[in-house]
Amino acid sequence: MLRYLTAGESHGEAIIGVLEGAPAQLPLTPDDINEHLARRWLGYGRGGRSKIENDTVHIYSGVRFGKTLGSPISFRIDNGAYEKDKAGWPEKMAIEGEPPEDMEKVTMPRPGHADLAGKQKYEHDDMRPVIDRSSARETAMRVACCSVARRLLNEFGIEVGSHVVRIGDVGFDEPEEWADRRNALIEEGGGASALYETADESATRMIDDGMTERCVEHIDQTKKDRDSLGGVYEVVVTGVPPGLGSYVHWDRRLDGQLVQAICSIQAQKAAEVGDGFFNAHRPGSQVHDPIEPREDGAQAYPRRTNHAGGTEGGTTTGMPLVVRGYMKPIPTLIKPLDSVDTATGEPEPTRYERSDITSVPAASTVAEATVAYTVANAFLRKYGGDSVPAIRRHVEADRAAPNE
């Protein structure tokens, strides 16, 4: 099974990651990871840090001559802001010594951020450690670690893609409004990669040009209003075999794991599998996906619709996995909100810390990564193996076995 840990602060020298459990003999190069690190900076409405960072992963172990070894893989991504920013981060984030005498402590928590909760939990008198570790900068390393899982899925014809369906008040209201376009892209391209490639061409990662233009205008107006925006995105996984996940234990249910994967990302406050929220107010006859006869040699029974999002009983059906994430507006606003200075106990307005107007497009690419990691773990649980050739033998045996 895969497991990864990340370490590092947003304005420290670097962020670090370690991934264990990756099978041996998996083709892997830094380019496989850097492609998706670059995509993480996509999207209209990003802040100043996107002009400072140029994320490139360094692999220090677990890979030799372009293939994984089966041992832990370690990564490093340097923080460009550490040296390029003129705020004196090498001194403010020093590992040793004492704080600079002129360093101002952060004592004003921002509503909606981890500042106050982290200060109280870890008893910091300065919220800078909370701000820097809870920052979405950490997701760069998540994307790096999870890109290995994505590369593993690709070896077996499983692809992951995403697109944005709403930013603030602008976007689609019902899944049927974008499903045909999404499905056509996937069918024409042969998998979910075609979905993300098309979305990446849009300033807002949407697959509808008219909606992209409206969202850009909405973001521009929100910037003038000194506010921020959240939104909704959809992640799709194609090529998934039936039987991943399980109904026999609560923690093996794949739909529950997918929701956790989305909501573990900073600022994501809700998730649904398939048409979950919409299904709640529809009659069952319009929700459940009719089963059709399968072709000779096929593993999965096709469904006329996919409102369930590719799972039933926490187990994959063979239909594409569909999961949506709901992101709250970024809590760092140009417009001050009411807060309290924890050093004095007096009411004070918040101060602005560099941020985006919206990062929903970026969040959708991070969600691709966490979903890929989750599906890869379910895949390994079913098929197992210490190397890619061993896993391939297990997959081929499963496909060849009669399954009534």
From Swiss-Prot:
Alphabetical keyword list: Amino-acid biosynthesis, Aromatic amino acid biosynthesis, FAD, Flavoprotein, FMN, Lyase, NADP
Ranges where the record places region Disordered: 283-320, 337-357
PROSITE patterns registered for this protein in UniProt: CHORISMATE_SYNTHASE_1
EC number per UniProt: 4.2.3.5
Enzyme class name: lyase
Cofactor binding notes: Reduced FMN (FMNH(2)).
Binding site for FMN: 133-135, 266-267, 313, 328-332, 354
Cofactor(s) needed for function: FMNH2
Gene Ontology terms: cellular component: cytosol
Presence of keyword RNA-binding: no
Pathway recorded for this protein: Metabolic intermediate biosynthesis; chorismate biosynthesis; chorismate from D-erythrose 4-phosphate and phosphoenolpyruvate: step 7/7
Coiled-coil intervals, chain numbering: none
Family as reported in the entry's similarity comment: Belongs to the chorismate synthase family.
Described function: This reaction introduces a second double bond into the aromatic ring system.
Protein's name according to its UniProt entry: Chorismate synthase
Taxonomic source organism: Salinibacter ruber (strain DSM 13855 / M31)
Gene assigned in the entry: aroC
